[in-house]
Amino acid sequence: MNPNQKIICISATGMTLSVVSLLIGIANLGLNIGLHYKVGDTPDVNIPNVNRTNSTTTIINNNTQNNFTNITNIIQNKNEERTFLNLTKPLCEVNSWHILSKDNAIRIGEDAHILVTREPYLSCDPQGCRMFALSQGTTLRGRHANGTIHDRSPFRALVSWEMGQAPSPYNAKVECIGWSSTSCHDGISRMSICMSGPNNNASAVVWYGGRPVTEIPSWAGNILRTQESECVCHKGVCPVVMTDGPATNRAATKIIYFKEGKIQKIEELTGKAQHIEECSCYGAGGVIKCICRDNWKGANRPVITIDPEIMTHTSKYLCSKVLTDTSRPNDPTNGNCDAPITGGSPDPGVKGFAFLDGENSWLGRTISKDSRSGYEMLKVPNAETDTQSGPISHQMIVNNQNWSGYSGAFIDYWANKECFNPCFYVELIRGRPKESSVLWTSNSIVALCGSRERLGSWSWHDGAEIIYFK
């Protein structure tokens, strides 16, 4: 074969290989496009939630062409529908309390970016439970932490994060902006309410499904405020207790009934309760009960009983002689269902809770009568109705050598149980005013739930060494 023939033969071979390579590439491209359309055209049928993965791998070593395609498609059950929560189950029997979660936020914040918060709570939805709190818009180690002892500022926001973690700028979800809040899930979506603005003209913004739906102006011009723990929904109706007016005199309290973030009805407070703030609410047996703070007079807590079906309420005081506000006098010989029991100094009150279920009733309170230190749970049968009722069982939650703070009720209404299991949290306040060597005021959280077993006591205190922050 002469040189010209060799050149022609080599050229023809090269062109043939190039054409073959081109055809393979075109075929591979067509296959990839076909797979994409095939995955995207999933028929609309009721099938289980599954992950399907289609993989195509093409390797042409002779021409150094490598093509790897990995397509993952998540197919959701389009016919799956959520339903409104229905509060028909009773409360579970409780003989003691087991630990659920403790976030250790202050301990972790000594060496990490942890948000300064207060007024925390927990609230659950069909997927699980989350922690909530009002952030101060800064971290424990941030310079803006100076002055966070103040309750109201334009830098506060309701944030939520995964239960058990410490709140940080990296895991916290902003629910709404404000310095007073409540939040609850109706089984379909979450409603969150935040108050913000100046003391004499604050307003509330109601969010539902991640969007603002309703705005509420101040009606008394004196710090419009709400529960600082979760609200509760029944068949889509979510009552919320709000107060506007003096903290140490008669104020204007309203029970506002929402559905999907929109106002259905507004009621002025009726009944025996003389002052209402910071209610802790739970639902069972078709009824919602809110145990509140009388910041004006009472060391016994006011109770609001709400019928969400017909959107009405009544109010009275916890009848038991076991007083649960702080500060408070010594427990008297008799309780009072119809009027506040006065006494105690210097603090006018603290947010608290109770579960009122006949013989299965439990009350929470600080161990100290005069300050927010220690915490205990007392089983007090018929505390709601019996002025002679006293404790038959006791469990320490935080010892009296450590600070506590606000406390409140919550329930995982979607747990797979035949009854609603009561749960509660305790705010563990650190920093100012009691610990003035640091510039900030913040908290960690401990949460416990009911147990039919008889479990022992332990102190679930905050545990941070303030000296490490100096």
Curated annotation (Swiss-Prot):
Enzyme class: hydrolase
UniProt-annotated binding residues for substrate: 118, 152, 277-278, 293, 372
InterPro entries hit by this protein: Glyco_hydro_34, Sialidase_sf
PTM info: N-glycosylated.
Membrane spanning stretches: 7-27
Region (Involved in apical transport and lipid raft association): 11-33
Region (Hypervariable stalk region): 36-88
Pfam entry (one): Neur
Gene Ontology cellular component terms for the protein in this record: host cell plasma membrane; membrane; virion membrane
One GO molecular-function entry: exo-alpha-sialidase activity
Cofactor requirements of the protein: Ca(2+)
Region of interest: Head of neuraminidase: 91-470
Reactions accelerated catalytically: Hydrolysis of alpha-(2->3)-, alpha-(2->6)-, alpha-(2->8)- glycosidic linkages of terminal sialic acid residues in oligosaccharides, glycoproteins, glycolipids, colominic acid and synthetic substrates
Residues that carry a glycan: 51, 54, 62, 67, 70, 86, 146, 201, 402
Keyword terms: Calcium, Disulfide bond, Glycoprotein, Glycosidase, Host cell membrane, Host membrane, Hydrolase, Membrane, Metal-binding, Signal-anchor, Transmembrane, Transmembrane helix, Virion
Membrane topology (UniProt): Single-pass type II membrane protein
Residues that bind Ca(2+): 294, 298, 325
Biological processes annotated in GO: carbohydrate metabolic process; viral budding from plasma membrane
SUPFAM superfamilies membership: Sialidases
Residue ranges annotated as Intravirion topological domain: 1-6
EC number(s) given by UniProt: 3.2.1.18
Domain observations: Intact N-terminus is essential for virion morphogenesis. Possesses two apical sorting signals, one in the ectodomain, which is likely to be a glycan, and the other in the transmembrane domain. The transmembrane domain also plays a role in lipid raft association.
UniProt subunit comment: Homotetramer.
UniProt function note: Catalyzes the removal of terminal sialic acid residues from viral and cellular glycoconjugates. Cleaves off the terminal sialic acids on the glycosylated HA during virus budding to facilitate virus release. Additionally helps virus spread through the circulation by further removing sialic acids from the cell surface. These cleavages prevent self-aggregation and ensure the efficient spread of the progeny virus from cell to cell. Otherwise, infection would be limited to one round of replication.
Protein name as annotated: Neuraminidase
Source organism (scientific name): Influenza A virus (strain A/Duck/Czechoslovakia/1956 H4N6)
Name of the coding gene: NA
